[in-house]
C-alpha cells in the first residue's frame, strides 16, 4: 500500500492519510519526544511506510493495552501526529523508534489496508483567548508545578525552568501532564 494524501488535503482543510501506530500504556502529546519499542507486524509496517515518505506517523492510544490485535474500534479517535526522528531495527525483529509529537489530530476514518492501519486524519485546532484570566491560570499552574517539582526529586530542575518559559497555555498543559 502506498502513502496517500486525501482529496480533502488538496483542498487545504488539513486532512490527510497517515499510517497509524497504536500505542499501549502511553499517550504522546505534542512537543513530547519519546522512545517506543514496537514489535507487532502491522505497527512495524506502518513505521516502514512512514519512513518511505515524510516520516509522519499517527500516534493514538489503544483503549485496552492488553489487546494484541486491535481493530479500529479499539483505538481512541484523538491522537498526535508525530515525526519519526530515528528508527533502529533490533536483532530480535522489533524496532526502537524515537518520535516527536507535533500536532493533536482526530481520526476521521480508517482507510482499508491489510498491511497496517491507515487513517484519514484532521488536525485539531487549539483555540484559546489570551485574557487576564487565562494568564492568571497559567501562572497558577506554573507555581503549582514548581511546588510539585520540589517534592518530586525525579523531575530534573531543568524541566521547571523550561515550563516557566512557556507562554502558550496549550503547550504548558501538554508539557506538565507528562510529569
Language-model segments: residues:
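N-terminal low-complexity, acidic/polar interaction/targeting segments
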Residues: 1-179
Amino acid at each position: 500500500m502506498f502513502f496517500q494524501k486525501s482529496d480533502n488535503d488538496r483542498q487545504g482543510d488539513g486532512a490527510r492519510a497517515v499510517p497509524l501506530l497504536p500505542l499501549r500504556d502511553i499517550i504522546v502529546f505534542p512537543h513530547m519526544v519519546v522512545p517506543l519499542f514496537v514489535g507487532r507486524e502491522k505497527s512495524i509496517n506502518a513505521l516502514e511506510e512512514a519512513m518511505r515518505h515524510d516520516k509522519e506517523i499517527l500516534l493514538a492510544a489503544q483503549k485496552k493495552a492488553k489487546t494484541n490485535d486491535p481493530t479500529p474500534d479499539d483505538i481512541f479517535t484523538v491522537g498526535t501526529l508525530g515525526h519519526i526522528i530515528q528508527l533502529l531495527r533490533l536483532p530480535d525483529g522489533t524496532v526502537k523508534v524515537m518520535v516527536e509529537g507535533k500536532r493533536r489530530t482526530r481520526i476521521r476514518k480508517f482507510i482499508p489496508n491489510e498491511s497496517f492501519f491507515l487513517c484519514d486524519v484532521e488536525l485539531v485546532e487549539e483555540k484559546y483567548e489570551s485574557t487576564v484570566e487565562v494568564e492568571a491560570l497559567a501562572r497558577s499552574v506554573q507555581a503549582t508545578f514548581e511546588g510539585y517539582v520540589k517534592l518530586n526529586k525525579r523531575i530534573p530542575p531543568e524541566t521547571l525552568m523550561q515550563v516557566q518559559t512557556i507562554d502558550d497555555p496549550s503547550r504548558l498543559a501538554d508539557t506538565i501532564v507528562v510529569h
